[in-house]
Amino acid sequence: MKKAAWIALLLMLCTALCACQKTTAAVPACRDAAAAVLASQETAEMTELSAKKIEKYLLIDETLYTDAAVCIDASRATAECVCVFTAKDGERLAAVQTALSDYCRAQLEQYRDYRPDEVPKLESALMKTRGMQTVLIVAPDADAAEAALDQIWNGQEKTK
């Protein structure tokens, strides 16, 4: 009888501990998140980068993420970009975030001399993370971009 009580107690404890386990937030596909942000903006013509070009321009290796969408100004005349990555794990997420921060800083230095009118966009660049998904947005209207991102993130949460 005592053995059965202990087993029941252990099962309840295991169930309670499993229920407290941290879950990752549901996130949309990177391409969907990028499209939502771009739809909120009046941007230059944007082009989506391949994994090879992501590694070349942003120094983010394909082994760090499970999904990505990076859209930049096709002409490179503006600093506008939407970079969305879903990392494989927390360690890789930190590496992606560091690379995005470095990219933004490098762009700021380049555009300071090349196109000083682009500097305010870079200075107000938005970097947000939800679960394993991190986003860098350099856009004409950072508030509208953030609202669009929050809307797709919250909409994704409601459907799960």
Where are these regions (language model features)?
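Short, compositionally biased low-complexity segments enriched in polar/charged residues
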Residues: 47-79, 91-95
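Second-shell loop/turn segments in exported
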Residues: 81-89, 133-139
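Positively charged n-region of N-terminal signal peptides that target proteins for export
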Residues: 1-11
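C-terminal motif of bacterial Sec signal peptides marking the signal peptidase cleavage site
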Residues: 15-19
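A short, solvent-exposed beta-edge/loop patch
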Residues: 74, 117-158
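Short Gly/Thr-rich strand-loop-strand
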Residues: 93, 97-129, 159-160
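Bacterial signal peptide processing site
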Residues: 21-23
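Post-signal peptide N-terminal segment of mature Sec-exported envelope proteins
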Residues: 28-46
